[in-house]
Amino acid sequence: MAKLVLSLCFLLFSGCFALREQAQQNECQIQKLNALKPDNRIESEGGFIETWNPNNKPFQCAGVALSRCTLNRNALRRPSYTNGPQEIYIQQGNGIFGMIFPGCPSTYQEPQESQQRGRSQRPQDRHQKVHRFREGDLIAVPTGVAWWMYNNEDTPVVAVSIIDTNSLENQLDQMPRRFYLAGNQEQEFLKYQQQQQGGSQSQKGKQQEEENEGSNILSGFAPEFLKEAFGVNMQIVRNLQGENEEEDSGAIVTVKGGLRVTAPAMRKPQQEEDDDDEEEQPQCVETDKGCQRQSKRSRNGIDETICTMRLRQNIGQNSSPDIYNPQAGSITTATSLDFPALWLLKLSAQYGSLRKNAMFVPHYTLNANSIIYALNGRALVQVVNCNGERVFDGELQEGGVLIVPQNFAVAAKSQSDNFEYVSFKTNDRPSIGNLAGANSLLNALPEEVIQHTFNLKSQQARQVKNNNPFSFLVPPQESQRRAVA
């Protein structure tokens, strides 16, 4: 048993200690960047999914795939898993979600009264934990872990997610793949896979792809296998394989009358920091002696690190910022230091809000690519590569995506009353170096070095070091003049 547990631990964590696989050299030889919009939309009964082409050079350089899902009222996104770790940012709305970790106990139990139908009574339903989410939440989904999501309110849920296809835990190719557990819908990245293979694929192969389009993972098994595996009749098997699906159901279905599952109450924003304590509360685990309460200390190592870990953290506008300037804006980050689940993903995220005409000074990320998604408003953004060439100089508007490769320098200036963005980063502990302002690279250089490096006079070198007292966010010049006056 000890060897089995040890092997399972090694399987879960083996890819996490290695360094991130480097992208192909030519994929990051970028002379020009563009703000990208989604180019594919798949409609479903309860909403729709939009995707960006992962074959585009910037996505290939970053080794990620991006999608955006919109859930209407009472919409359920069917369970699925992917070939790489995911980060999901809730741009809008509230709801519930669940993840299924193989080997973890089902610690949630539905109330007995909800299971009654007339005089008959069914066994109580037990399942793994259901979590609530709200706007601004960052959700961590490890590789191969199945998850589902449901909108129980009137406001549509908009969720933006990345899949890290360059992760060492992805042992397939770099094409993102989503494996649905149910339904008969189109896999949102299949179109791009077919485009990539189109040149070498025979007509017969194309026909096979079309026939397989819209199948869930169970549909490929022989019905007799599933009948025996689940112990059910053939009618149920046909449903499991998606044969009785409405044509327009898709990956997002509408639950008539609403979904009734047990979920914890939504915690107030100021209680978010106490989530770790909530995860350590004793849980009810079914044994041959009935319901046994177990504390975190009494469970095995896998339970402590996987089954009870916190899966979401709020980094939106209602969270406590890491950097705040009342005239310029705020920045909030989530790394594995404060959100340990990100250690499994080797990913992190940053939320930023810039007031009109405020600037995020030129800076670069030392150890990660950045996938910047504009949540609201617009900003003028400039990106510079290693040759000193401006590879992007334009507006990034709401719904647009800009990929900034590792070590490329970037600066942004808000053009609207409030520019908001979320930046996904391909490292769980990213380091950012600012090129101007307090604590910047130039600020840390000796004055004499600056003077002779840039051919400046002593007073000019002093101005370069000390004229900007702000670290990352610079207020509009008019507000600085008012403050001086």
Swiss-Prot record:
Hexamer; each subunit is composed of an acidic and a basic chain derived from a single precursor and linked by a disulfide bond. Residues 1-18 form the signal peptide. It is found in: Endoplasmic reticulum; Protein storage vacuole. GO terms for molecular function: nutrient reservoir activity. PROSITE patterns: 11S_SEED_STORAGE. This is Glycinin G2. PANTHER family: GLYCININ G3, OS03G0336100 PROTEIN-RELATED. Residues 272-281 have a biased composition (Acidic residues). Disulfide bonds join 28-61, 104-307. During soybean germination, seed storage proteins are hydrolyzed by protease/26S proteasome. SMART domains: Cupin_1. Keywords: Allergen, Disulfide bond, Endoplasmic reticulum, Seed storage protein, Signal, Storage protein, Vacuole.
